[in-house]
Amino acid sequence: MTNIRKTHPLTKILNNAFIDLPTPSNISSWWNFGSLLGLCLIMQILTGLFLAMHYTPDTSTAFSSVAHICRDVNYGWFIRYLHANGASMFFICLYAHIGRGLYYGSYMFQETWNIGVLLLLTVMATAFVGYVLPWGQMSFWGATVITNLLSAIPYIGTTLVEWIWGGFSVDKATLTRFFAFHFILPFIITALAAVHLLFLHETGSNNPTGIPSNMDMIPFHPYYTIKDILGALFLILTLLALTLFAPDLLGDPDNYTPANPLSTPAHIKPEWYFLFAYAILRSIPNKLGGVLALLLSILILIFIPMLQTSKQRSMMFRPFSQLLFWTLIADLLTLTWIGGQPVEHPYIIVGQLASILYFFLILVLMPTVSLIENKLLKW
């Protein structure tokens, strides 16, 4: 009798993707983050759904509806903080996943990589519009400042901003449409993630050595299902610890003050996961230049496969490239710190130097050092 798992049209797809999938035998825990991102997405959609049942996307009631969720809804505070801190966990996994791709040369699967960059942009958009919904001070001013960046676009900028706002300032129309975007985008992310997976399974996974592993594959289940479950337990434990012991650790106290267009907060800043890009934006004293640098800081990922000059795919056996990679990580952490600081000396100059180093490392140093490594290996 044929196994239904391998013959039924629906289970066959699942079987080929998660059970009998041939997987390299040597992939490390850095390969866990893909499944953890899937778990984060499911958790965010579920908690978000329950929050949407009680939230009202109207300027006069949005803030109080969030307070109502936290005070009056059964376990509403728990759902709300799971959702808020779940976003932080999502970005931690996302950045680790991208870092893994950069280190081990996974970007050489170009379709998978490009869909991944598109996914990153979509997740960032979702997080941004979601941050506006509680309608606190930082929600309102964050929305005002970031949407205003589009006014730097020559000729059509101002019209574009007013079109997005649905008026002459961030108001009711803006909040309503941002709620609509925040509701629909996760489903678009889910569809893109399926395409991401589809392209990945066309080529099979990369592995830490960067050498083709066709001759040494093992089935995904049970070897990697059990490994993914362990990763999931760590993720859930961290999320629960954060949610139950320090729910506001990563948030901004200003967002507990209702939005007031007449009072600007002393320091307008986004959530921690956008601070590196915000620091790059602020480091350029020209508005259009800042916006372009902000865009390029993310879109530079698309050009990574074109900047590959090494004859080896992975950085596993390339100590000089490893040094530059960890310098890049340190630089990003510096930018994240700078993004949360006020615009004054010495933070301005540190931010500018860190921004220059970020682009210089990716566009110049890493490709050059890769060529030197080729020479040293007589390739």
Swiss-Prot record:
Coiled-coil intervals, chain numbering: none
Signal peptide positions (record): none
Source species, domain of life: Eukaryota
Keywords attached to this entry: Electron transport, Heme, Iron, Membrane, Metal-binding, Mitochondrion, Mitochondrion inner membrane, Respiratory chain, Transmembrane, Transmembrane helix, Transport, Ubiquinone
Annotated residues for binding of heme b b566: H97, H196
GO molecular function: metal ion binding; ubiquinol-cytochrome-c reductase activity
Binding-site positions, a ubiquinone: H201
Residues that, per the record, bind heme b b562: H83, H182
Cofactor binding notes: Binds 2 heme b groups non-covalently.
Membrane topology annotation: Multi-pass membrane protein
Gene Ontology BP terms: mitochondrial electron transport, ubiquinol to cytochrome c
Location(s), subcellular: Mitochondrion inner membrane
One GO cellular component, as annotated: respiratory chain complex III
UniProt cofactor(s): heme b
Residue stretches spanning the membrane: 33-53, 77-98, 113-133, 178-198, 226-246, 288-308, 320-340, 347-367
Record-linked PANTHER family: CYTOCHROME B
Known partners and oligomeric status: The cytochrome bc1 complex contains 11 subunits: 3 respiratory subunits (MT-CYB, CYC1 and UQCRFS1), 2 core proteins (UQCRC1 and UQCRC2) and 6 low-molecular weight proteins (UQCRH/QCR6, UQCRB/QCR7, UQCRQ/QCR8, UQCR10/QCR9, UQCR11/QCR10 and a cleavage product of UQCRFS1). This cytochrome bc1 complex then forms a dimer.
Family, as annotated: Belongs to the cytochrome b family.
Other information: Heme 1 (or BL or b562) is low-potential and absorbs at about 562 nm, and heme 2 (or BH or b566) is high-potential and absorbs at about 566 nm.
Function as written in the Swiss-Prot or TrEMBL entry: Component of the ubiquinol-cytochrome c reductase complex (complex III or cytochrome b-c1 complex) that is part of the mitochondrial respiratory chain. The b-c1 complex mediates electron transfer from ubiquinol to cytochrome c. Contributes to the generation of a proton gradient across the mitochondrial membrane that is then used for ATP synthesis.
Name this polypeptide is given: Cytochrome b
UniProt organism field: Cephalorhynchus commersonii (Commerson's dolphin)
Lineage, highest ranks first: Eukaryota, Metazoa, Chordata, Craniata, Vertebrata
